[in-house]
Amino acid sequence: MTVNYLEQPARPQAPVREAAFHQWTSHNDAVWTFFYRQQTGYLLRFPDMADFEVSADGRRVRGWPAHGAASSTVDHLYLNQVLPLALSRQGKLMLHGSAVDIHGHGVAFIGESGRGKSTLAASFATGGTRFLTDDGLHLEWVGGECQIIPSHPSIRLWEDSQEALIGNTAAVAPALVFTTKSRLLAGPGIPFCDQARPLRRIYFLGEGEASVPTIERLRPAEALICLARNSFLLDIEARDMLAQHFDDVSRLAQLPIYFSLDYPRSYDHLPQVREAIIRHACEQERHAP
């Protein structure tokens, strides 16, 4: 990935004179990230954890841990939050989604936080299907074909998902202070695909109301809305980048690859869900022109 990252020594989070032009909030409405503009680019502030300066072109990032913040926390924030945003500033298409390699093709899962993107990817991986990304779904057009670009080789899971799917058999990165999620490193029990794969399907995850795995086709207009809603964008007010991003997702939305997917949120159902996804993706592949 074309980002030059350099972690700096810890420093205090000094007050910023300008108002933030955007912010992310967590599930309890606390501010998770402040977005500021600077002369040379952007400042992303994660309160009490780290500051990141991103160059205007998204190619250079410097990170400063807050005093007392662990290096593992800064690494996690960079990989899962800052890097996708920096790549978006380069014009890369970055989405909130996980992906796996099914028979040489990329199959992605997109949805709001808590819909089970990481759990699905981990479930496939523990069943022997290599994962491409846990989040920060990176798509690129190569020779007229849209491909999934692999991300970093780790998966984040809540404790109950880890216990149900993996147990204590995987290598775990150091604990993070701001979440009880574990970051599980790829290995023999969680195989990772480190090569780009042609995008075959994108499934948008439902709320878990279905009693059996249910897959339904989405129209291009529906897919466009879902893609836009689940995009990483560093500067939501930069008109040139917004115009390019809209063109990118509009082109992507024309592909006949979008489906809604809902299923019971029970670990016991996951083998059935995996089977339904594989069968559906392969059937669609056989009938593709």
Each language-model region and where it sits:
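Long, basic/Gly/Ser/Thr-rich N-terminal segments
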Residues: 1-70, 275-289
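Short linear motifs in intrinsically disordered
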Residues: 29-36, 89-91, 129, 249-250
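A short, structural micro-pattern
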Residues: 38, 57, 94, 195-197, ...
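Extreme N-terminal, non-catalytic leader segments
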Residues: 45-106
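Glycine-rich, often acidic-flanked micro-motifs
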Residues: 98, 102-112, 127-289
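Conserved lysine of the Walker
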Residues: 117
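Post-Walker A alpha-helix
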Residues: 120-121
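Aromatic pocket-lining residues of Rossmann-like dinucleotide-binding sites
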Residues: 124
